[in-house]
Each structure stands twice: as C-alpha cells, then as structure tokens.
A protein has these predicted regions:
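Hydrophobic transmembrane alpha-helices
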Residues: 1-51
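Extracytosolic (periplasmic/ER-lumenal) interhelical loops and adjacent juxtamembrane/interface segments
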Residues: 53-57
Length: 167
C-alpha cells in the first residue's frame, strides 16, 4: 500500500470517527442512524477505502460504544462481511448506481449480526432489533448515496464514463 492510500484511509477513518462522535446518541443500540455509515459507499469507487472505514468503525466502537467488547467483534465483523459481499459483486457490476444499491443491501441485510450482538449483550429481541437496525442502515445508506455519488465523481472520474453507467 502506498503512502497516498494510507493517508487517504487515515483521513477516512478520522472522518468516520468524528461523525460518529457527533451523532453518538443515534449511532448505537437497537435504533440506529449512524450517519457515518454513508461513507461505506466509498468502497464503490476504490476497494482500498474499505480499510479506512473498517478502522473508523473499530475506533468509533472502541471510543463510544456502550458495549465495547461486543461492538469490536460484531460491529467490525458486520462491516467486513458487507464489504466482502460488495467487493465480490463489483467484479460483475460496473454501473455505479447498481454498485451503490448492492452495497446498501449488503449493509442492510448484514445488520442481522448487529441484532445478534444486541441480543447477546443487552437481551434485545432479535427479529425486532434486526428490523429496526436494518431500517436505520437502509435510510442512511440510501439517503447518503447521492452525496457519495457526487463525491465519487471527484475521486474516481474513470467510473463515470458511458461504459460504467450502462448507457
């Protein structure tokens, strides 16, 4: 990994941590609207950005989670699993919006791991918790997609030619 990639991932992690700190009351437990999750869409433009986001998740959970030990395992694990699904699917999907849709669904569905975490740690009902955390994740990722699309046009303009847009 080159210095530029490492520096960029460091900045991504720092932004993730800072945004999570600002919205801390809404970023944990059974009803979550962790706005920093919209950064997950960065992986659509460069797979290596997943490193910065996972580091951000790790440190945000370490610093702010009320159930640190669980969140370091399940929270980070959920991010890694969702990124793996997205990255593998990107081999077959070239359209940026389609990639963002798959990424949104990957993160939404894998919130089942967070529901399991909250059941084990706090005794929350699994299915209801999966529903509420998945809704929060979907809302943040879906509303964040246009913002990250605009950011992506600056980060990876090569992805926005007609071949990748399905035109």
């Amino acid at each position: 990994m080159n210095v530029r990639t490492m520096a960029t991932n460091g900045l991504i992690a720092a932004v993730y941590i800072a945004v999570t700190a600002l919205i801390q009351p809404f970023g944990f437990t059974n009803i979550q609207f962790r706005v920093s999750e919209l950064l997950n869409h960065l992986v659509v433009f460069r797979q290596t950005y997943a490193i910065g986001i996972v580091l951000g998740v790790f440190f945000a959970n370490l610093f702010f989670s009320p159930i640190v030990a669980y969140d370091l395992v399940f929270g980070v694990g959920q991010s890694v699993l969702a990124f793996l699904i997205t990255i593998v699917s990107m081999r077959y999907i070239k359209n940026v919006w389609a990639r963002m849709a798959v990424n949104t669904l990957s993160f939404t569905v894998t919130m089942g791991l967070i529901a399991l975490e909250l059941k084990l740690a706090l005794g929350f009902p699994f299915w209801l918790t999966w529903l509420t955390t998945a809704i929060g994740e979907f809302v943040v990722m879906a509303l964040g997609a246009p913002i990250m699309y605009a950011v992506g046009r600056r980060l990876a303009p090569e992805l926005f030619n007609s071949a990748h847009q399905g035109r």
